């Protein structure tokens, strides 16, 4: 294709440079189940290992199937390069380890996925990397926590349970003033939000969720926006400005642009250092499965979002719903962020507070017939979970409230079924939860 494509529906099918398999002319992307690759000669092998030229060495680091997925996701996000990894959690881990070392710190939004909170609060701390938390309701809270060892900002575009859209540009601008990159987890908002367009430097995804979209494979990725100057402040980013002894003294901020002609030092370092040393590659079979999901992701996101809007309209009026949480239902500046950053929909995640507390929430979950009760989001199917008795069950009542998890709170991931069927299942389950609450009171 000679014309640059910009529409996500087309990028999902044609993004990158894959047109057909060079060996067989197959149109569908093949699964390359191989660990290693034949070198052309000894000079070629030496050059590949010395990073004097790029090519396949070992599937822990790169694979032709993964390469197609990486280029398409990079194109979808508007980035220059992408590195796939074994899970979304691995993507978050690599994003931090790529910029931080022991003694460094980074600043994260308080609105985070629980697994990421554990990673940042406990595991990163054991590595000597400090996470400082900033309330995202005021972007200036990030600036207040900066010191000379701060290496990055981190946030989620559309975090639950609050579903408050993050102020991407405002925080990115603060970061760039101090030469600090903003890393955005865009898992819950692919297609409908482009963080790189608003100043983020890196985007991470759990490809397991909406991009994969079918609850069949686990995967993650890091997208390098190519819009951050890692060499502007060498003291701020030593990982990119000091010689790397493991690669013959290579200085990543200098050698990568020289080698590739592109500002993709973040992606290259993540691939050749972190995948090399820590593993966590995405299996080619899983990459192939995610490619199948990616091809229809823009279409599914439209249906996810449209169905969620209809479900929200219904839930707001139901007598057994205390409160509905959705990006468009916030007030003031937080509501304005939805209009500013989300285009083509407001996401598939919906939070509800079921009247009657914990018991009513449990009864609602147990009464659902079409929704699946699982700890996942972003499936084509509709999903539900009651965090107070599952994902957050180890927390005290005070900790639950601080996390935004109230006794009757239920998280819904609205699928692509017919909206009438989604609403019918919610209705009968809510009616059942109300009966349960009345019996408990009586």
Residue ranges: model-predicted function:
Residues 1-56, 438-442:
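N-terminal glycine-rich, Lys/His-bearing helix-loop that initiates the first secondary-structure elements
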Residues 80, 121-122, 148-151, 300, ...:
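PLP-dependent enzyme catalytic core of the Aspartate aminotransferase-like
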Residues 54, 80, 286, 290, ...:
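Short amphipathic alpha-helical segments
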Residues 301, 309, 313-316, 320-410, ...:
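Conserved C-terminal alpha-helix-loop-beta "cap" of PLP-dependent enzymes
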Residues 2-3, 14-20, 81-320:
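Conserved PLP-enzyme active-site core in the AAT-like
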Residues 158, 187-189, 329, 355, ...:
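Active-site beta-loop-alpha junctions enriched in small/polar residues
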Residues 36, 41-93, 115-123:
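Conserved N-terminal alpha-helix of the aminotransferase class I/II PLP-enzyme fold
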Residues 36, 225-228, 354-357:
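Short loop segments at secondary-structure junctions
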